[in-house]
Amino acid sequence: MDAAFHEALARGIEALGLPVDAAARALLERYADRLLAWNRKVNLTAITAPAELAEKHLVDSLVLLPFVAGARTLLDVGSGAGLPGIPLACVRRDLSVTCCDGVAKKIAFVKAVSAELDLRVRGVAVRAEGHPEREGLPRADAVVSRALADPDRWVPLGARYLADGGTLLAMLGREVDRAALDAAGAAEGLTLVGLDVYELPVSHAARAVARWQRK
């Protein structure tokens, strides 16, 4: 990876105060390298500039670290190339992550890179439709999706995969009306416990993370 990648990664980690040590940074770099290598043959990401990838894929995934601090298991729904699950597993080596996606070639990458990096990540080629046992998916302490940003769609689906006491997370490209988030959670017996708004430090793109827990 080039100097721009390292600068963007370091700047994002430092600006957001993320607990990422040197060993984790090395794993993140190897993941990014394999992602771009596979992407030449398999369409995994539209972002191919290393610095942009560092910020918009890696740093943006790692923003979840404080919100999953107490989790032992995490389910990443619609994971694509393993985002945010694999970056989180690079930092939280104790975290058991399941990445699921309906596109088999993307899960083939998830499996290959996780084995190469010796991460506690399992890839499952299935479209999550709310039937964890039938789909071979776990009920997890933390359930997240970057792919399904619409809370009206995501909350009813994600709630079905929550373990007792678990946290449902939505990564949003913008701040959403809090009342709408409250209502989406209440319909599933969940309470909105946080709506954190932040800005990516290089691109200044606005982001938000919403969190729900069962009442």
Curated annotation (Swiss-Prot):
Keyword Glycosyltransferase in record: no
GO molecular function: rRNA (guanine-N7-)-methyltransferase activity
Binding locations of S-adenosyl-L-methionine: G78, L83, A128, E129, R146
Its EC number(s): 2.1.1.170
Main location: cytoplasm
Cellular compartments annotated: Cytoplasm
N-terminal signal peptide: none
Reactions catalysed, as given in the entry: guanosine(527) in 16S rRNA + S-adenosyl-L-methionine = N(7)-methylguanosine(527) in 16S rRNA + S-adenosyl-L-homocysteine
GO CC aspect terms: cytosol
Domain of life where this protein originates: Bacteria
Transferase found in the keyword field: yes
Pfam families: GidB
Assigned keywords, A-Z: Cytoplasm, Methyltransferase, rRNA processing, S-adenosyl-L-methionine, Transferase
SUPFAM superfamilies assigned to the protein according to its UniProt record, in alphabetical order: S-adenosyl-L-methionine-dependent methyltransferases
HAMAP family referenced in this protein's UniProt entry, alphabetically: 16SrRNA_methyltr_G
Function: Specifically methylates the N7 position of guanine in position 527 of 16S rRNA.
Sequence similarity: Belongs to the methyltransferase superfamily. RNA methyltransferase RsmG family.
Name listed for the protein in its UniProt record: Ribosomal RNA small subunit methyltransferase G
Source species of the chain: Anaeromyxobacter dehalogenans (strain 2CP-C)
